[in-house]
């Protein structure tokens, strides 16, 4: 058998770990020396089955973390939660007969299966052991014995296969057993279940570079490091040039608007020395309404200058107390347990001083952990639950608390989490068709794809990312957890990470947003294609509800709101999207992010920095679109002075010399076919003029001089419109309302581009570049158009 060597990366909490894997041996890197939230590692391959062997009685001491430099990988039991023995095969038609191990193991544990009972929200349910939980999972997926036909299918399985259009005689034994395990309904409470089909649609939208969702191009030459990020480091105490990434403004907890704090705007940011295990939070400030990126200043590390990698502070949110102090909500991370990331939601009161030039941190008090066990165990996975089955691949999350206050003055935290026993991770989730969301044909095809790919199967077994919500009680400076609720969003079987949630109220609706990397999902085909075509797989997802604590539905049908536009190692790559309300608007949001992935992936000295912000519009029908409005870097408050063209780019200007080489250094992807896109223009939600059905003359003109004109009957809502087709290959598609009169506004479309390395530079046709060539061409076009109107009787 040929030995193959490839580099793989996996994410442990917010830490990326690089490993070289062969068919027999893995060499790891100590977790204490790697960094959080490293995005150029987008190629994450689930090494669940390859990294280590799960013992039948796994304990809380993770030997995988302890011995990852010397672990011998054995091709025996999978490391998914139910210790499945499903073998990897290249074809679904291959007959597999070794499921006896699963059935035997399940039968042994059937009598020990534990019944999961709901616990009180204030009392973490950690009493149920993982052995019992595992036994329950295995019992749930045991193949039923009441097969009824010659193919070994149950009545339900036969119906599913028939609806899917499958030739029953072609089914393998493995596929028959899988179909017999399928559940069509689930009693588990999930909030909105992010389905496999939704994930698929999100990836396809990213690949298509739909301009409604594709992040605008930025001018790479205009991007600079943040001056305020050259500051005293929290760990070393020395002045250093720091990366700045996840950031959040001090906001009104009810409206979400950036607070004017004594004439200043305040922002809390994660910062650290590149290529160092240095993850702490700092307070940044600028005059309120000042759009100059260079005017931002640094008040320093919020928790002082004796910080260590053992105790870190990750993302959160902040608001202002009645006495003017800040109430900070953040993630306190303890890495002392074999370098694992024990994440807990925490809060602290930050007392500030100021004058007309500066803001100072005077003291920090009331620093307390709100969730000492991590999750409560029932709604959300606790640290102990995760630790007892962790073998080096499963992601744990209890982080990024976002504070929001309702009309009654009650405060809630929305946060990233992992599902608890209410809807736990496990192999049985693969056979739960409520997780798929498609037709029988789609669901069965996807199920069989899992059977074909051990990596995907394992990812699906572990995946249990969620967006959670809890209610606070008590004094606002020293709050306590009052109640945990069922997740607002769950993604069992689909994704293992949904980051940085925030909720914004627009009008009478609540909008939930979260950032994610698709490579933390189980659909390897989808995110690998995104990497191949675009070079990155980051997205922002959005959901809407009439209530804060439940009822969320995906925006744009799938949940997609923003998609990556450029490769992960370009200077203008972005992530960690955070939506900020625009004062006085009920349908626009300012989208903020950091730019340039951490640890100098875009080149030496090109640190992570704040990106230019841009607008999106939220429409009444539950759709959104990116608008052609952009700011300078680090603008958190949109007003008329925010608008600039300095940072606006095209695909030609979105990269620095040497970046557009068709290669991303994660060792698996080479080449990508980027597509141009143009953000939309702002449109009021209430039309200013009535919609009429008029005679429209449409015509297409190509640059080689061909003209095609034909009158058609369409619905038109303005004096004229220009349609740009991504597939037009340089043609103009113009529709003109004859009755309205006026001038024709003609804009060349974006030309299609070649996917090869030599020609994948943007063929972005700008008015400037084509103006000289276009003036005489468009004059001739107008003359032809006028003659045509007269010839058919229009005046």
Swiss-Prot record:
It is found in: Cell membrane; Cell surface. One of its GO terms (molecular function) is levansucrase activity. GO terms for cellular component: cell surface; plasma membrane. Sucrose binds at residues 245-246, 315, 399-400, 497, 517. Residues 42-83, 103-138 are annotated as: Disordered. The keyword RNA-binding does not apply. Its EC number is 2.4.1.10. Keywords: Calcium, Carbohydrate metabolism, Cell membrane, Glycosyltransferase, Membrane, Metal-binding, Signal, Transferase, Transmembrane, Transmembrane helix. The active site is at 246 (nucleophile), 499 (proton donor/acceptor). The chain crosses the membrane at residues 774-794. Residues 42-66, 112-130 have a biased composition (Polar residues). The keyword Methyltransferase does not apply. It is a single-pass membrane protein. It comes from the Bacteria. The record marks 400 as: Transition state stabilizer. Its main location: membrane. Pfam families: Glyco_hydro_68, KxYKxGKxW_sig. Residues 1-36 form the signal peptide. GO terms for biological process: carbohydrate utilization. This is Levansucrase. The gene is ftf.
């Amino acid at each position: 058998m040929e030995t193959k060597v490839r580099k793989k990366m996996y994410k442990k909490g917010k830490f990326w770990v690089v490993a070289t894997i062969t068919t027999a041996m893995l060499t790891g890197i100590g977790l204490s020396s790697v960094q959080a939230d490293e995005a150029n590692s987008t190629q994450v391959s689930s090494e669940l089955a390859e990294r280590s062997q799960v013992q039948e009685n796994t304990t809380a001491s993770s030997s995988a973390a302890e011995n990852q430099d010397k672990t011998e990988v054995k091709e025996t039991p999978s490391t998914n939660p139910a210790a499945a023995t499903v073998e990897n095969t290249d074809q679904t038609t291959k007959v597999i007969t070794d499921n006896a191990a699963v059935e035997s193991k399940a039968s042994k544990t059937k009598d020990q299966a534990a019944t999961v009972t709901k616990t009180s929200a204030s009392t973490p349910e950690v009493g149920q052991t993982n052995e019992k939980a595992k036994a329950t999972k295995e019992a749930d997926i045991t193949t039923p014995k009441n097969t009824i036909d010659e193919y070994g299918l149950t009545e339900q399985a036969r119906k599913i296969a028939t609806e899917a259009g499958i030739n029953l005689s072609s089914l393998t034994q493995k596929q028959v057993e899988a179909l017999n395990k399928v559940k069509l309904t689930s009693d588990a409470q999930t909030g909105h279940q992010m389905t496999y089909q939704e994930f698929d649609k999100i990836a396809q939208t990213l690949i298509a570079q739909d301009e409604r969702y594709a992040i605008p191009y930025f001018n790479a030459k205009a991007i600079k490091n943040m001056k305020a990020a050259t500051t005293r480091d929290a760990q070393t105490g020395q002045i250093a040039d720091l990366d700045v990434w996840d950031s959040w403004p001090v906001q009104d907890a009810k409206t979400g608007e950036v607070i004017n704090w004594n004439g200043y705007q305040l922002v809390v940011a994660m910062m650290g020395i590149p290529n160092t295990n240095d993850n702490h939070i700092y307070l940044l400030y600028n005059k309120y309404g000042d759009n100059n990126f260079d005017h931002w200043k640094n008040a320093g590390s919020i928790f002082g200058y004796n910080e260590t990698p053992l105790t870190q502070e990750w993302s959160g949110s902040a608001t202002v107390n009645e006495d003017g102090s800040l109430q900070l909500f953040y993630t306190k991370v303890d890495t002392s347990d074999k370098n694992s990331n024990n994440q807990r939601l925490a809060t602290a009161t930050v007392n500030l001083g100021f004058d007309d030039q500066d803001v100072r941190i005077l003291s920090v008090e009331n620093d307390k952990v709100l969730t000492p066990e991590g999750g409560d165990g029932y709604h959300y996975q606790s640290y102990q639950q995760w630790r007892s089955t962790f073998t080096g691949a499963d992601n744990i999350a209890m982080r990024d608390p976002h504070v929001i206050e309702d009309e009654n003055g009650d405060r809630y935290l929305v946060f990233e989490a992992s599902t608890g026993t209410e809807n736990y991770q496990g192999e049985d989730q693969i056979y739960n068709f409520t997780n798929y969301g498609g037709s029988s044909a789609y669901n069965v095809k996807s199920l069989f794809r899992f059977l074909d790919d051990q990596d995907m199967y394992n990812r699906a077994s572990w995946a249990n990312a969620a967006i959670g919500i809890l209610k606070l009680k008590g004094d606002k400076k020293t709050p306590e957890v009052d109640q945990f609720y069922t997740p607002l969003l769950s993604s069992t079987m689909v994704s293992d990470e949904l980051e940085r949630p925030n909720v914004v109220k627009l009008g009478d609706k609540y909008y939930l947003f979260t950032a994610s990397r698709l490579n933390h999902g189980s659909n390897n085909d989808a995110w690998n294609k995104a990497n191949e075509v675009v070079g990155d797989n980051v997205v922002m997802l959005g959901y809407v509800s009439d209530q804060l604590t439940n009822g969320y539905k995906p925006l744009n049908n799938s949940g997609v709101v923003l998609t990556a536009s450029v490769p992960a190692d370009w200077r203008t790559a972005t992530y960690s999207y955070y939506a900020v309300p625009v004062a006085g608007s009920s349908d626009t949001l300012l989208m903020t992010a950091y730019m340039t992935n951490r640890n100098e992936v875009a080149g030496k000295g090109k640190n992570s920095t704040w990106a230019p912000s841009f607008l999106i519009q939220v429409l009444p029908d539950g759709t959104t679109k990116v608008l052609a409005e952009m700011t300078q870097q680090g603008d958190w408050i949109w007003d008329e002075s925010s608008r600039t063209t300095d940072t606006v780019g095209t695909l030609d200007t979105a990269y620095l010399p040497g970046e557009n080489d068709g290669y991303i250094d994660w060792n698996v992807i080479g080449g990508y076919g980027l597509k141009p896109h143009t953000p939309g223009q702002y449109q009021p939600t209430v039309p200013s003029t009535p919609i009429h059905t008029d005679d429209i003359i449409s015509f297409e003109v190509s640059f080689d001089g061909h003209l095609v004109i034909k009158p058609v009957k369409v619905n038109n809502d303005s004096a004229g419109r220009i349609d740009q087709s991504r597939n037009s290959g340089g043609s103009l598609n113009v529709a003109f309302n004859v009755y309205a009169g006026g001038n024709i506004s003609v804009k060349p479309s974006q030309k299609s581009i070649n996917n090869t390395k030599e020609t994948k530079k943007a063929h972005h046709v700008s008015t400037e570049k084509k103006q000289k060539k276009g003036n005489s061409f468009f004059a001739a076009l107008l003359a032809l158009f006028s003659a045509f109107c007269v010839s058919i009787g229009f005046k």
